[in-house]
């Protein structure tokens, strides 16, 4: 009889332990959208809300919000993941063709968890993230005109698929922010600027005409593979510009104030002009 009581006690403890583990797993589980994880806080009850929006051509995301953007031709809508007390403070408004995603109440000292927003909408001609916000583009993007990507104040934009721009590509990262693309971007022209400790990193960049790079104030620009007709680089104040490989017909470099430019592995089929001063370092094709 005593043995049966002991066995029953052990079994009860095992069941309680398994239930506790299952309960903890449920609390800490993070939802995902098409295999993109939406991280949530375990100490808050996260709720989700689907909102319909009107069509837009540009997008701006601000403080404390992470956006996953899926370009689509279907009717646009957003999905918001946030703790219930703050749900009504998060705004997803379209005005003048711009989708703005932001918190209405941004009083100093007010603490809240980061919001996760999934956007299903049309092709955007401009995406902007600021004040620590992030945008991840999950889908091929084909822009009929120009495309502008801009980050500031610790924000980030990441493109995980190919981007085709019929017009000009404008990329600007400032104040410790980051812009990165993991696949290929192709465009007619490109104007790319990194300043104030920011970072721009790209896998493949194909530009039919001129590509201009302006890297300054301890910023970094790293393009793994570039193909362009004219490569124009201006680097200053301890900045770095690196092009791992590629080809061009003309290279123009202006490097100053302890900056570093490396285009040594780019095949250049034409003229190369180098102007360096104040401790700058330039590695160019032989």
Say what each PLM segment does.
Residues 1-286:
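Intrinsically disordered, low-complexity terminal regions
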